[in-house]
Amino acid sequence: MQAIADSFSVPNRLVKELQYDNEQNLESDFVTGASQFQRLAPSLTVPPIASPQQFLRAHTDDSRNPDCKIKIAHGTTTLAFRFQGGIIVAVDSRATAGNWVASQTVKKVIEINPFLLGTMAGGAADCQFWETWLGSQCRLHELREKERISVAAASKILSNLVYQYKGAGLSMGTMICGYTRKEGPTIYYVDSDGTRLKGDIFCVGSGQTFAYGVLDSNYKWDLSVEDALYLGKRSILAAAHRDAYSGGSVNLYHVTEDGWIYHGNHDVGELFWKVKEEEGSFNNVIG
C-alpha cells in the first residue's frame, strides 16, 4: 500500500511546504520549473494550434456563433460562505448546452472526502475531472501522512495543476470548502487560470449577481445554523428565478468540524411558492 501511495501521491516535502506560509516561494518555483508539481498532473495532449483557447471559443461560443456545432454544458449558480457554525454550500442543479436545458439534476458538489467539498461552475467535464483527480491526491496523502490534508494544501495543488494548462481552453470556477482544527472553516476559490483566493463569501456562475444580492443583504457572521441554511437556499432561489441558466433544485450542505452534512435536495418550484407565501416576496408573480 505504501508503494502505491508513493507512486501516485504528492511528495511529502511538497505537501509539508504547502501547509506553511511560504506560498510565494512555492509559486515562484513552480513557474521557473524548480517545483515537482509539474510531474503531478495527468498528461493531456494539447491541440497543435497557436491558441487552443481562441480555437475552442470560435467553435463553441454560442453568443457569437449561434450555429456552432459544439455546445458545451455551462450556466450555473454556486455559493459558499463562512459563519460561526461552519460553512454553508448551496448549488443549483441545472445544466444548459446552448439554448436548451441539458439536465435538471446535475450534482454540482464534488464530495472530495468526508471533510472537504468542491463546487462546479464552468465546463462540467473540466470541473468533474480535476476535482475527482484532486480527491485521489487527498486520499493518497491521508494514507501516507495518517492525517487529513489541509484545505490550503488541497486548493494549492489544484490551482498549480490547472495553471499548467492556462490558455488551453479549460473552463472551471470552483470553491474548495473544508474544516480542519488548525484552519477552522476555510473556503478557497480556484479557477482554470490558476487563480486562488481565500475568502468568507463566494458566489460563482451565471446567476451569481442575483445570489450575491440576497446573500450580501442578509449575511451575518453570527447566523444560527437554521438561518444560514435558509440563506443559502434563498440565495440560490433568487438566482434560479432570474437567471435562465440556473434552476432545477437546490442541493444544500453544511460543513462542520466533524465533517460535511447533506441537507437535502429542494425543488426550486416548490421552494418558490413556499418562500413567496412566507415572505410575501416575488410580488411580480401571480399564482
UniProtKB/Swiss-Prot annotation:
Keywords: Cytoplasm, Hydrolase, Nucleus, Protease, Proteasome, Threonine protease, Zymogen
GO molecular function, one term: endopeptidase activity
PROSITE patterns to which the protein is assigned, alphabetical: PROTEASOME_BETA_1, PROTEASOME_BETA_2
Annotated bortezomib binding sites: A124
GO biological process, one term: proteasome-mediated ubiquitin-dependent protein catabolic process
Catalytic residue positions: T76 (nucleophile)
Pfam families (alphabetical): Proteasome
Highest taxon, organism lineage: Eukaryota
GO annotation, cellular component aspect: cytosol; nucleus; peroxisome; proteasome complex; proteasome core complex, beta-subunit complex
CDD domains: proteasome_beta_type_5
Reaction catalyzed: Cleavage of peptide bonds with very broad specificity
EC number: 3.4.25.1
Primary localization class, coarse: cytoplasm
UniProt signal peptide: none
Subunit structure of this chain's protein: The 26S proteasome consists of a 20S proteasome core and two 19S regulatory subunits. The 20S proteasome core is composed of 28 subunits that are arranged in four stacked rings, resulting in a barrel-shaped structure. The two end rings are each formed by seven alpha subunits, and the two central rings are each formed by seven beta subunits. The catalytic chamber with the active sites is on the inside of the barrel.
Any further remark recorded for this protein: The side chain of Thr-76 acts as a nucleophile, and the N-terminal amino group acts as a proton acceptor. Present with 8530 molecules/cell in log phase SD medium.
Job description of the protein: The proteasome degrades poly-ubiquitinated proteins in the cytoplasm and in the nucleus. It is essential for the regulated turnover of proteins and for the removal of misfolded proteins. The proteasome is a multicatalytic proteinase complex that is characterized by its ability to cleave peptides with Arg, Phe, Tyr, Leu, and Glu adjacent to the leaving group at neutral or slightly basic pH. It has an ATP-dependent proteolytic activity. This unit is responsible of the chymotrypsin-like activity of the proteasome and is one of the principal target of the proteasome inhibitor bortezomib.
The protein's name: Proteasome subunit beta type-5
